Amino acid sequence: MNLRSVGALALILGIGTAGAALAQDDAEERDMEAEHCVRVDDVDDIDIVDAETLIFRMRGGEVYRNDLPHECPGMRSSDTLMYRSSVGKLCSVDIVTVLEDWGFGFAPGVSCGLGMFHPITGQIADEMIRAAE
């Protein structure tokens, strides 16, 4: 490999490294905007988009997208969710449980961990729900 080839290779590797660093910066910036917790008293409604995504609609108009860290198998948009909080907050370390409708009552189903709460607009939330239908 001659000196020119080494220089070109270093430039290519440098560009790739810079691109990866920029992508990491973008991800960190999005996470900086995200909230670890929301107040339980402020939760007005929870929409299930799919087995990996929830939409939290808050009193006061805020809307958050919660990307679950792992797929929640069997969770459907028509399901009802249950959660418990001893501190008045619902956080990214907490768990939601799908309530199974047995016709004569509900029984706990699968439980799944929450992710970070990413602020989004109501319009984006509505578009996500429509796209998932």
Where are these regions (language model features)?
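Positively charged n-region of N-terminal signal peptides that target proteins for export
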Residues: 1-5
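Short, functionally important structural connectors and interaction interfaces within domains
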Residues: 7, 29-30, 35-38, 104, ...
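Bacterial N-terminal signal peptides
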Residues: 7-17
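Sec/Tat signal peptide C-region and signal peptidase I cleavage site
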Residues: 17-23
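N-terminal secretory signal peptides
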Residues: 23-78
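Helix-rich interaction surfaces within compact, conserved domain-sized segments
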Residues: 70-133
